[in-house]
Swiss-Prot record:
Upper classification of the organism: Eukaryota, Sar, Alveolata, Apicomplexa, Aconoidasida
Predominant place of localization: other
Function: S antigens are soluble heat-stable proteins present in the sera of some infected individuals.
Keyword terms of this UniProt record: Malaria, Repeat
Identification of the protein by name: S-antigen protein
GO CC, alphabetical: symbiont-containing vacuole
Compartment(s): Parasitophorous vacuole
Compositionally skewed regions (Basic and acidic residues) per UniProt: 1-68
Keyword Repeat: yes
Region ranges (Disordered): 1-76
């Protein structure tokens, strides 16, 4: 029930606004302020709390509740 390819809004292949392939403002290829190379606080290389390598709660490798590998509740 935490499918990484969910059609929700937080999976990596999601058509939502937070996936890496998303056209939203949080994907790694986004021109927004939350991509992995961004100096913001949500990219995977960021020191923030939402990147996949972060200790936060939204990255795919996070122990939080929104990443595709998470034990959370958003990928369904």
């Amino acid at each position: 029930e935490f499918r990484p390819n969910s059609d929700g809004d937080k999976g990596p292949n999601s058509d939502g606004d937070k996936g890496p392939n998303s056209d939203g403002d949080k994907g790694p290829n986004s021109d927004g302020d939350k991509g992995p190379n961004s100096d913001g606080d949500k990219g995977p290389n960021s020191d923030g709390d939402k990147g996949p390598n972060s200790d936060g709660d939204k990255g795919p490798n996070s122990d939080g509740d929104k990443g595709p590998n998470s034990d959370g509740d958003t990928e369904f």
